[in-house]
Amino acid sequence: MKKNLMLIFGGVSFEHEISCKSAYSIYLALLDLNKYNIYPVYIDKCTGVWYLLDSVSDPPKPINTDVLPIVSLLPGFGIFSNNKNLEIDVVFPVVHGRTGEDGAIQGVLKVMDIPCVGAGIIGSAISSNKYFCKLLLKSFDIPLVPFIGFRQHDYFLDKEEIKRNVKEVLGYPVIVKPAVLGSSIGINVAYSENQIESFIKEALKYDLTIVIEKFIEAREIECSIIGNEKMKIFSPGEVVVQDFIFYDYDAKYSVIPGNSIIFNIPAHLETNQLLSIKEYAFLTYKNLELRGMARVDFFVEKKSGTIYLNEINTIPGFTDISMFAKMCSNDGLQFKDLVDNLIDYAFQSYINRKKRIDFEN
């Protein structure tokens, strides 16, 4: 008997359109598997309302929400649409960024007592905040590019002190980032003190916490991991960016003549670098209590070969240009089997959690 699977995508997020592309790829894989009754749920970008679809269309085809039934969640009872309990067995969230990767949807589904693909509340929340994630990883001796972080309130209290710290602790150039956003949105490189203030103001449009890192000339290496307590770490890949300073949103999703981005899978690494990257990926996945899947991103400094962990994506992209699935495929795990495995991990994690909180026995 087929399980009922809800595929959630869209969201009130700057990464809304990427989520729709990821969902379409996963939807096609689910159709190919023919193991699940698929209930696609679209979250409106402006209102956050959940709508039930018949299918997932190939983006960027617009979705007319005026004629769609609304989805309602009733804890203890189920997920409803058109006054009918959909009896959902598992949810596959593909909402990138806020409310999707920050533990919000994961928390809702935990309250609903429904298995959820991917990381749980804690792993999602920590991984989504670059500043707090870096502080935690630093305590586990994971190598990081030198950084400082601060809240908007701190910046307005003593702007000059923060600018002085940037100059003395990091030195220019630096990268200015909002703490909570994916796809490198809102990121700028400041080459001098004249630029830093405007770039901080730009980043504050996206988040109240800011991270500033020392800018280094580095190779960008990515590593896919799947599994729960037992995990599989795939051969890392490299993103070679030709027409951009770094792999930002425009580099990832803009169409540039001349093929401006090259994906090297597997990445060309020294044996010791490969082993170190896999070890740091393993320690990160374990210490952040991640499960299901993650893409762990690294820098390898071009001059010294030093490895630094950059960030973690708990719901990586599943578009046709996304590295996560490409790295899995390179090691022999095809896309539809990857999707199937991720769903299995969700059921396994749910069963293990229920064993620990069974109040009846």
Swiss-Prot record:
ATP binds at residues 167-222. It holds the Pfam family Dala_Dala_lig_C. It is found in: Cytoplasm. InterPro entries: ATP-grasp, ATP_grasp_subdomain_1, D-Ala_lig_Van_CS, D_ala_D_ala, Dala_Dala_lig_C, Dala_Dala_lig_N, PreATP-grasp_dom_sf. One of its GO terms (cellular component) is cytosol. It is an enzyme of class 6 (ligase). SUPFAM superfamilies: Glutathione synthetase ATP-binding domain-like, PreATP-grasp domain. It comes from the Bacteria. Its EC number is 6.3.2.4. Keywords: ATP-binding, Cell shape, Cell wall biogenesis/degradation, Cytoplasm, Ligase, Magnesium, Manganese, Metal-binding, Nucleotide-binding, Peptidoglycan synthesis. Its cofactor is Mg(2+); Mn(2+). One of its GO terms (biological process) is peptidoglycan biosynthetic process. Mg(2+) 1 binds at residues 297, 311. Binds 2 magnesium or manganese ions per subunit. The keyword Cell wall biogenesis/degradation applies. It catalyses: 2 D-alanine + ATP = D-alanyl-D-alanine + ADP + phosphate + H(+). Pathway: Cell wall biogenesis; peptidoglycan biosynthesis. Disulfide bonds: none annotated. PROSITE patterns: ATP_GRASP, DALA_DALA_LIGASE_1, DALA_DALA_LIGASE_2. Residues 134-344 form the ATP-grasp domain. GO terms for molecular function: ATP binding; D-alanine-D-alanine ligase activity; metal ion binding. Signal peptide: none annotated. PANTHER family: D-ALANINE--D-ALANINE LIGASE, D-ALANINE--D-ALANINE LIGASE A. Cell wall formation. This is D-alanine--D-alanine ligase. It comes from Borreliella burgdorferi (strain ATCC 35210 / DSM 4680 / CIP 102532 / B31) (Borrelia burgdorferi). The gene is ddl.
